[in-house]
Amino acid sequence: MNPTAMCNPSSSSSSSGSSSSTKAWIVHGVAVAAAVAAAYLYLTRPAKFRSRVVGIIPARFASSRFQGKPLVRILGKPMIQRTWERAKMATTLDQVVVATDDEKIAECCRGFGAAVIMTSESCQNGTERCNEALQKLEKKYDVVVNIQGDEPLIEPEVIDGIVRALQATPDAVFSTAVTSLKPEDAFDPNRVKCVVDTRGYAVYFSRGLIPYNKSGKVNPHFPYLLHLGIQSYDTKFLKIYPELPPTPLQLEEDLEQLKVLENGYKMKVIKVDHEAHGVDTPEDVEKIEQFMRERNFL
């Protein structure tokens, strides 16, 4: 018997095993190196990374759905005041200001003690208004929180949550929050839906129901997400946002978040246990007042 022939299978098997083992170690080494690099970048960030934070409440009088919405009274107080009072309770904000192009809104806000920044009428959305207000502030900030003026019951903890998420995620330039979507809001275009990936980054936002299954019906077992409309930005990104070209999805859905995603930037999303109470139409005022009365939230 040829001893060489007897050894060949064993030798081949050994060689194959060795090759597989080597490949496994290479893959493992690459993964470890990537983890070490990520940890290094995280740990070597400046000690005060994104530490200076300003909250800006953009407010405009003109609205196709609800003219003069910021000044509508909710149980005796202007809605913009209720939003400002809630924002002031957030512990991560160094300052809270209102940005508006309307003198009536500015006068109202100064009356209850809010700092006001006057902006131009040319701002296309709240993000652009926040950017213009940022340029006019005397102090320098690392993070801007865009606080929707039509969320008079916004939880301070939600504001703090998105700020901390942005501070902890160096590769994201934007952060926002979502909560569970109610079945009755599934097909309401005023309730923006969101899908996220397994790492908590935004994949898409839509006024339609997403994901949308073949039956065309709401799946009662699927955890649909509702966007809360509050967002924070790294100020370096915010300054270039107006220069980014409008994108097809942004224009089709009329959602400024899509401009960020379509231009290739990352957006961190946190899930919170918060019931959304946005005011989009005059009918919403009565609903939110009833909610506040029931909970003695005056």
Give the predicted meaning of each segment.
Residues 139, 219-298:
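Conserved alpha/beta core of the MobA/IspD/sugar-nucleotide pyrophosphorylase nucleotidyltransferase superfamily
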Residues 48-99:
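N-terminal glycine-rich phosphate-binding loop and ensuing alpha1 helix
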